[in-house]
Amino acid sequence: MKPLEQVSIAIVHEWLGPPGGSEQVVACMLEVFPQADLYVLVHDPDRQRGTPLEQTPIRTSFIQSLPKAKERYRLYLPLMPLAVEQFDLRPYDLVISSSHAVAKGVLTRADQPHISYIHTPMRYAWELYLAYLTESRLDRGVKSWLARLVLHYLRLWDVSASNRVDVFLTTSPYVARRIQKVYRRTAQVLYPPINVDRFRHDLPREDFFLAVSRFVPYKRMKLIVEAFSETGKPLVVIGDGPEFENVRRAAKPNVQLLGHQPNGTVTDYLQRARALVFAAEEDFGNVPVEAQAAGCPVIAYGKGGVLETVTGWPASNPTGVFFSAQTTDSLQAAVQLFEDHEDLFTPEACRRNVERFGRSHFQRELRATVNEIWKNFGTGGN
């Protein structure tokens, strides 16, 4: 059997949009397996400038050439199952998919192991289905029934496609439980990579709160902006996306929206903010981990991956405060609680809490895991 260094590998991902957690995973995978070829359905090269993926050769699907696909790739979601099945991966020994939608549905040979790193089952097709319809104004009328039909089809395809995967890896125990619920499959947890070493945690804090996120409905950026607009507390918001204009209209003068910013700017703000505000129910949540690496406490909605990455007050050495409901009142109460006990949240405790999520740990564990799967598959032990 070939050693892993000589194995030909295809890495498959859905899309490369604004740099985020899944893009960091793909970049790390390519560092671990430099011989791998990268396949994505669609990507915007301009979004990858200054990132580790800027110089990476990328093979794309037919969606790449469709109108406005680079900017509004989600419009082509109904075509993505078909598109991912057109990738010809026959020449490769091993396939690794990085999937939050359809990448796990690639077609592989019987003797070709397929390892899928699942960021999440398709949230908008499963547990966020009804919320997605409401927030997208697709909860009534003819368009609503068309959207429901498409999402029904995607759920059927999604479950069917999960059977094409030999081994599931995932980001957290929280997502592993969802994979078991949706696909009836077990998944091994491998926490995603965070470049904690790029942050300093010993810089002076300044008088502003910070939110960093893509502007999509489930991130609840409008909730954060409305809560701070009501209290007048200074808030800086970094990120962009389809909800940006909707959120901007809710912002009062105490809220500063910076739009998309390069990594260096995000790092600078995380190192100076009083606290990060995070309102999403996220499967893992890279930004709260990055904030703690920068010595910045986290005020977060208390569901999902943050329960595994943030030590909530009143525990000893707390690194954050949780709020119990996605409402302005609940968030404002959490901010007040943080301010009342701010001296308890030390930069040193924040940094110590997230050392376990470093890039080197992810890369070491990924290589060992893939090597073990490769050896077992070749000997019939899968």
Language-model features, listed with the residues they occupy:
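Short hydrophobic beta-strand element within catalytic cores of glycosyltransferases
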Residues: 297-302, 307-310
